[in-house]
């Protein structure tokens, strides 16, 4: 999120076309979106493994 604010605050050194900015922002949001989904899926996966492991241990004990 920091990068987005930095890019918003930074003025363009050259007159940028609106299309370029549009594509750039879409790309930026897509990357962030994918990263958040990836992180949340990793957390879910981790918690499932942990849960299964606990269950497995309790069965053996």
Swiss-Prot record:
Signal peptide span: none
Subcellular location, record wording: Cell inner membrane
A GO term from the CC aspect: plasma membrane
Induction trigger: Expressed approximately equally in exponential and stationary phases (at protein level).
Bilayer-spanning residue ranges: 18-38
Topological category with respect to the lipid bilayer: Single-pass membrane protein
Keyword Cytoplasm belongs to the record: no
Pfam families reported in the protein's UniProt record: YncO (PF23695)
Principal place of residence: membrane
Keywords, alphabetical: Cell inner membrane, Cell membrane, Membrane, Transmembrane, Transmembrane helix
Protein name from the UniProt record: Protein YncO
Gene designation per UniProt: yncO
């Amino acid at each position: 999120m920091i990068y987005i604010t930095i890019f918003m605050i930074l003025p363009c050194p050259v007159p940028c076309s609106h299309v370029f900015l549009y594509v750039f922002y879409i790309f930026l949001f897509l990357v962030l979106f994918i990263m958040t989904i990836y992180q949340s899926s990793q957390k879910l996966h981790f918690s499932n493994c942990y849960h299964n492991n606990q269950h497995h241990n309790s069965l053996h004990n």
